[in-house]
A protein has these predicted regions:
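Conserved cytosolic headpiece of P-type ATPases
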Residues: 1-729, 739-740, 753, 780, ...
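Generic alpha-helical transmembrane segments
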Residues: 710, 755, 777-791
Length: 869
């Protein structure tokens, strides 16, 4: 069998014979045999992790391993209750993490369009419609305008067949397909006698023979490469990994020092171990991973409502770190809808919004552009070449119905457009006779024009007329507009027109069109720059068109900031790393160029977001720190490679997502500050008790109760703090910036010190008579209540008490009330006293607990008033 790569070099007869022998179609029996051999026409699914694998991965964290060791030590020392509580806590966290991960994966599955589009194939000699997945090698498939191509294949017949291959090649202009063999080794975009899976028929009809299905298509090859690409860690994952390792080392060091001190002071080894276990449990924020997961999950829900679906939870925060956004042009920054912007009629430039159907010449332009046009509108879906749909849409806006115009002036013959002639002509019966209407490239048309229409009269065309037309055409083109000329010729009788009739034309006017920017793009780009993010346009379109759009929306200041892909080809990686700093628009780029551009920005220390919709974008989406796929125009391969999907294909949605990402990171920092300062307070109390030869102030169950119940709720509430728009007025944080900055550690130390002081005071008050249970109960209660109140301290770097901010988070109010009720239940319900190692407190002792807890909050709020930290 001839290799797939060579099919475009072979004749139709050779390919037919090679794939199907003497048959012109496949029988049902042959289809079944081939499906057993080649499989179905679908992309292979990656191997999924089982629920057990996901569950076990939750135990990889350093902090979790320390807790497991603590549980084993407790069990060895006979502290079975403490060991059981620690293990239950670890298991609960693992279950929560597993559930959230599986939920995210299930959400992704619901996004995938599992049903391939149907296709018309010849089976047993008859044309039948079947699901795309049932197509096999050797099938003969019929195509018409509006069809998606379900597999790769060799064109057998082409009736003006034009295919949009932008999803695969990035080329925005449709490709005219032929059936003749080609010579030499050609790149994908030049194989004009081949069609490819995922492409779209915009014009004409055709028939092709399937040569590749599933993973053997061009789409499948890219999907296969993606499966071999490793996942990149997001900045938050890297930060939390570093944070966990640093904290683990600090905790282990403190435990070792405390154990050694206890032994050196003559304490029993078992007691020394209990102190060390208490310290480990006090220091480790057990619920941190679950809290981060919950906060990110809430963030994804909020972002989904705004049009951004997050495939990978950690990418939510990753967006907040982005410093460069490499965006596609078509459909993301623009409307993905060709629109008429100007007419040139009767020697005048007329902006589209000023076109008047009451003007005879302008009405004639509107109607002629609709007649010499093959686009249709079926149930609201536009089918046809985008330039032609733009003409019909303008007529519709001006109150001219395409159907009524076509019914009034029926077409009797045509000369279809082809890329060599660059013209299209149609022949119509008019009220006053017969007219051939021609539209096409201006330079080609002017060579065939003998006359020009001015003020309702026809005159011989002059050199001055031609110069004026060429000047306007050049002005339009330099503004990034696509320009077509409209001309016509009257005939006395009906005839079947040919290319020979495309002469002695009357020039009517010019149509200038473009895919205009989205109305919100300019504001989004401005927000992007204000946030310290560099917006870059990367497109397969022409440089002039791309630069015109980029200038309109504020990405480009000067044409010197635009380049074409060929300029990159001759550069080394080092040269490109320097080059990207000054370039804002890349035109006529290939998938390889996109990957190199992304890498160059990353080499300069940037976090890069990359948008894309085509199969050809998939590898660049994977290479980027945050890959953003288009939900409307995006291919499934692009969506699978991305970490975020835009349901509205809108650049402005990315900026909203960046704002959400930054707010989420700030809120996670607040939650971590809250957890660490509370845990630091407990550490200080344990160390102070050891140095003062006092008993261990807390049972492990006390600390686990606080860390998991009364601490988790405020921490989650802090993670769900209202978003603040001022985050977009700051530059992206440095890639290597740690959560544990100097300022952050000072806040944790000061706040933890204040809380630790009041807790130690409570312990000493309770221990006046040597009652260890009373002392432990008071210390536990003050630590618990102080940390509940401390949630309000962590809301902002300034005082919030007696301000509206104190009450602006309903989750915080709920967290405080829930925690207070749980603490009250532990202290007031006798049946719980034994398990939690507490006793009932008298009124005076309760007042001391409430007073000391309140003091901790007031002191920290006072410090915030004096020094913002």
């Amino acid at each position: 069998m001839v290799s797939v790569k060579a099919y475009y070099n072979e004749t139709v007869e050779t390919v037919r014979r090679d794939l199907n022998g003497e048959q012109d179609f496949l029988t049902n029996e042959e289809v079944k045999r081939r499906q057993e051999k080649f499989g179905f026409n679908e992309l292979a699914e990656g191997k999924k992790k089982s629920g057990l694998q996901i569950f076990l991965e939750q135990y990889k964290d350093f902090l979790v391993l320390i807790l497991i060791v603590s549980a084993v030590v407790s069990l060895f020392l006979g502290e079975t209750e403490s060991a059981a509580v620690i293990l239950v806590v670890i298991t609960m966290n693992a279950i929560l993490g597993t559930v959230q991960t599986i939920k995210a994966e299930n959400s992704l599955e619901s996004l995938k369009q599992l049903a391939a589009p149907e296709a018309k194939v010849v089976r047993n000699g008859a044309v039948v419609r079947i699901p795309g997945r049932e197509i096999t090698v050797g099938d003969v498939v019929h195509l018409e305008a509006g069809d998606y191509i379900p597999a790769d294949g060799r064109v057998l017949e082409s009736a003006s067949l034009k295919v949009d291959e932008s999803a695969l090649t990035g080329e925005s202009i449709g490709v005219d397909k032929i059936s003749a063999p080609l010579t030499g080794e050609l790149p994908l975009g030049d194989r004009r006698n081949m069609v490819f899976s995922g492409s779209y028929v915009t014009y004409g009809r055709g028939v092709f023979l399937v040569t590749g299905i599933g993973m053997n298509t061009e789409v499948g090859k890219i999907a296969g490469l993606l499966k071999n690409t490793s996942e990149k860690k997001t900045p938050l994952q890297i930060n939390l990994d570093r944070f966990g390792k640093k904290l683990s080392m600090i905790i282990l060091l403190l435990c070792a020092v405390l154990f050694a001190l206890q032994v050196l002071k003559g304490g029993a080894v078992a007691d020394a171990f209990l102190f060390a276990v208490a310290l480990a449990v006090a220091a480790i924020p057990e619920a941190l991973s679950s809290i981060v997961t919950i906060v990110l999950a809430f963030g994804t829900r909020k972002m989904a409502k705004e049009g951004a679906i997050i495939r990978k939870l950690q990418s939510v925060e990753g967006l907040g770190s982005v410093s460069v956004i490499c965006s596609d042009k078509t459909g993301t920054l623009t409307q993905n809808r060709m629109t008429i912007e100007h007419y040139y009629v009767d020697g005048r430039d007329i902006p589209a919004d000023q076109i008047d159907p009451a003007n005879p010449l302008q009405e004639q332009m509107l109607k002629f552009s609709i007649l010499c046009n093959d686009s249709t509108n079926v149930e609201g879906q536009e089918i046809g070449d985008p330039t032609e749909t733009a003409m019909v849409n303008l007529g519709d806006k001006k109150g001219i119905s395409a159907q009524e115009v076509r019914d009034a002036c029926p077409r009797s013959s045509e000369v279809p457009f082809d890329s060599d002639r660059k013209l299209m002509s149609t022949f119509h019966k008019m009220k006053d006779g017969y007219t051939m209407i021609t539209k096409g490239a201006v330079d080609v048309m002017l060579k065939r024009v003998d006359y020009i229409q001015k003020g309702g009269k026809i005159f011989p065309v002059t050199e001055v007329d031609v110069e004026n037309i060429c000047r306007v055409n050049e002005q339009y083109s330099e503004s990034g507009l696509r320009v077509l000329g409209i001309g016509y010729r009257h005939f006395p009788v009906e005839k079947n027109i040919s290319t020979e009739d495309e002469q002695r034309l009357v020039f009517l006017g010019l149509l200038a069109m473009m895919d205009p920017p989205r109305t919100e793009s300019a504001a989004a780009v401005s927000d992007c720059k204000r946030a310290g993010i560099c917006p870059v346009m990367i497109t397969g379109d022409h440089k002039v068109t791309a630069a015109a759009i980029a200038k309109r929306i504020g990405i480009l200041d000067d044409i010197s900031q635009a380049c074409e892909g060929v300029q990159i080809d001759g550069m080394s990686d080092e040269e490109l790393n320097e080059f990207v700093e000054n370039i804002r628009v890349y035109a006529r780029v290939t998938p390889e160029h996109k990957i190199r551009i992304v890498r160059a920005w990353q080499e300069r220390g940037n976090i890069v977001a990359m948008t894309g919709d085509g199969v050809n974008d998939a590898l660049a989406l994977k290479q980027a720190d945050v890959g953003v796929a288009m939900g409307i125009t995006g291919t499934e391969v692009a969506k699978d490679a991305a970490s975020m999907i835009l349901t509205d294909d809108n650049f402005a949605t990315i900026i909203k997502a960046v704002e959400s990402g930054r707010n989420i990171y700030e809120n996670i920092k607040k939650a971590i500050q809250f957890l660490l300062s509370g845990n630091f307070a407990a550490i200080l109390v344990v160390i102070a008790a050891s140095l003062m030869n006092l008993p261990v102030p807390f049972a492990p169950v006390h600390l686990l109760f606080i860390n998991l119940l009364t601490d988790s709720l405020p921490a989650i509430a802090l993670g769900l703090e209202p978003y603040h728009h001022d985050v977009m007025g700051k530059k992206p944080r440095p890639v290597k910036e740690s959560i544990l900055t100097k300022e952050f550690l000072i806040r944790v130390g000061v706040e933890g010190g204040v809380i630790g002081a009041v807790v130690l005071t409570a312990f000493l008050i309770g221990y006046r008579d040597g009652n260890e249970v009373l002392a432990g109960t008071m210390a536990f209660a003050v630590l618990c209540l102080s940390r509940l109140l401390h949630g309000y301290n962590c809301k902002a770097g300034k005082p919030v008490i007696f301000t509206g901010e104190f009450f602006d988070n309903r989750f915080m109010q709920g967290a405080f009330l829930s925690g207070f009720v749980l603490l009250t239940a532990v202290l007031a319900v006798p049946v719980l006293h034994g398990f939690f190692a507490v006793q009932t407190l008298k009124i005076g002792e309760l007042l001391a607990v409430y007073g000391l807890s309140g003091v901790s909050m007031l002191v920290i709020q006072g410090l915030k008033r004096m020094v913002k930290f």
